[in-house]
Amino acid sequence: MKNLDDLLSEGVRGRRVLVRADLNVPLDGDRITDDGRVRASLPTIEKLTGAGARVVVTAHLGRPKGEPDPKFSLAPVAARLGELLGADVALAGDVVGESAKSAVAAQADGSVVLLENVRFDARETSKDDAERGALADELAALVGDGAAFVSDGFGVVHRKQASVYDIAKRVPGYAGGLVLSEVEVLRTLTGDPRRPYAVVLGGSKVSDKLGVIQALLPKVDKLLIGGGMAYTFLAAQGHSVGKSLLQQDQVESTCKLLEEHGDKLVLPVDVVVADRFAADAESRVVDADAIPADWMGLDIGPRSVELFAGILAGSRTVFWNGPAGVFEFPAFAEGTRGIAQAIVDSGSFSVVGGGDSAAAVRSLGLPEDGFSHISTGGGASLEYLEGKELPGVSVLEEGR
């Protein structure tokens, strides 16, 4: 798989380089609440502009319905990217239309153009190969002959989409530094990780993570379960979970996992329950098998944090994906904070699997450099660990 260094050694001055970045940041109105993904895109863009490339960035934001929608505009991202780069970033008013063509034609060496949200074009996410291919053809024409494509949006490499997969069949493709480092870290986890190897999985739904749980259990020493999905596991043990999140249709498969891998699966022993789903709800700590009928579990309890921390302290490799509770509410953030701190304190090779876990690290004020690696792609990380092919990576490995 060719990478950014290979491209730079070829020389990029005056060449157009299309960079697929992951700039899918959370917004409050037009204010970016977590710019982690924008920051993660900087090294690749800066190396290219520093070498004189004419950088054209394509990315998505949210899930627009295949047509322009002002609330999903990349305008706030263009502004923030410009601030971080210390240079103007021109935002094209469309994806491959006249505005994009004009912006790209006007580029000087070392400049950056950000195309408008690629998902404003319905062909980006089409299941029809020909439709996606048509958009990829237009993207290739936009950057012209002699151009290169750098895939640096790890958060989307598990998607077979025009700007991720099909474009690499039309323009010579290279893995950006971000994608390369992410794949190397995941290969470490799936290859020969230092043991003991512990995985912490949180989040709301068992159904979202059943595949990765089944794939990981034969490979890990301990798998710790937190978050909303813990209540389906507790129900599978025969406990009443009150009004906690429960996927009744997953209880049977969860029960089977407990029967086959009960020695590896570790569940909460106590939980923080609330009388309603709200930041100011009344709350108390109860044993995991004593959740009141009208209450809901919104976090793991202090004894669970202590139990999990003890396991993590003795681990040499840790992968964490998904918060332990509703960390956005301060009263229910201590489980997530405790797990994160225990991972940092363990001194292990530690990987935070993107998504809400990465957001939690930042919002709770934990030191990012306390972890070996914070992934920018939650879904992509999980699919890789599950053994699924990542189309955006495999197409680079095949080469054009």
From Swiss-Prot:
N-terminal signal peptide: none
Highest taxon in the source lineage: Bacteria
Cellular component, GO, one term: cytosol
Protein name in the entry: Phosphoglycerate kinase
PANTHER family assigned to the protein according to its UniProt record, in alphabetical order: PHOSPHOGLYCERATE KINASE (PTHR11406), PHOSPHOGLYCERATE KINASE 1, CHLOROPLASTIC-RELATED (PTHR11406:SF23)
Cellular location(s): Cytoplasm
Catalytic activity reported: (2R)-3-phosphoglycerate + ATP = (2R)-3-phospho-glyceroyl phosphate + ADP
Provenance organism: Saccharopolyspora erythraea (strain ATCC 11635 / DSM 40517 / JCM 4748 / NBRC 13426 / NCIMB 8594 / NRRL 2338)
Record family assignment: Belongs to the phosphoglycerate kinase family.
